[in-house]
Amino acid sequence: MTLTFGSNSKTAFLFPGQGAQVVGMGLELYERSGAAKDVFGKVDEALGRPLSKILFEGPEDELRETINAQPGIMAVSLACVGAMNENLDKDDIPDPVLMAGHSLGEYTALAAAGVLSVKDAALLVQKRGELMQEACDSNPGTMAAILGLDEMTLEEIARESGTFVSNINTEEQIVISGGKMAVARAMDMASARGAKKVIPLRVGGAFHSGLMESAKAGLIEALNNVEFVEPNVPIIANCTAQPLKSAEEIRGELIRQIASCVQWKRSVDFMIRSGVTNFLEIGPGKALAGMVKRIDRNANISNISDLESILAFSKN
């Protein structure tokens, strides 16, 4: 599910991760775009269940489950890609020089860049969600967002509290994870050291931390059963904030990523240093756009999440 590229603008495509889900997402695309409907059909067929029904109708608690939220967000993002190709002239679609996805969104980026088929991406994302849930059951944990402290301070707090730094989203928005008691200690320590805000996250476990190590073996097995094609656009890796250019690099990244910190700020910084001035977030929500704006106030940011925003984008 690759975009038909057009202009030569210095644009990066961004794909959101878990947390962007909302009941009803993708329904308008399904009803009004044949290409989007085809994406939802392929995902449902690959998973052997009517995931799209959960996306469109809920209930919210069921949609929030990792095995539904992750492939669901990916499906909506790829449906947006399909609808863009279907409804915009080639010259209206910016030619991305780089792509990146936040956590789960990295898999969406791989599909958009032609590395994975929609079917294989859906199966991998569902398997990843199952493995993460199993790891959560074996090693219960949670996460918290810390606002207003720098990375060095959070690294110190993580060492002292027995937690992990899991997402470095912006200079002052960092997520920690670990066992529930350890995260509670870290939150208290962060508050004592001057954090502007400490926010416990409603998540099912300590994602992107050492507590997810047990998920790697199953993921390696799943990745070995999938064919990877060389990307037609470099993808910025979550773990290293460097471009992935080969199938071998991509496999290694996906294995590391499940239990490692998402280096989102460094990823955006790399894209900016590479000359990117325009960022297009494709999929539900606007979380990544907000992060990019906090990283670089001068960045030009657009969002594509439904047919209305796609048609409006063509007029820009």
Q: What role is predicted for each listed range?
A:
Residues 19-20, 47, 113-259:
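Alpha/beta catalytic cores of group-transfer enzymes, especially the acyltransferase/condensing modules
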Residues 310-315:
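Short, charged, surface-exposed secondary-structure boundary motifs
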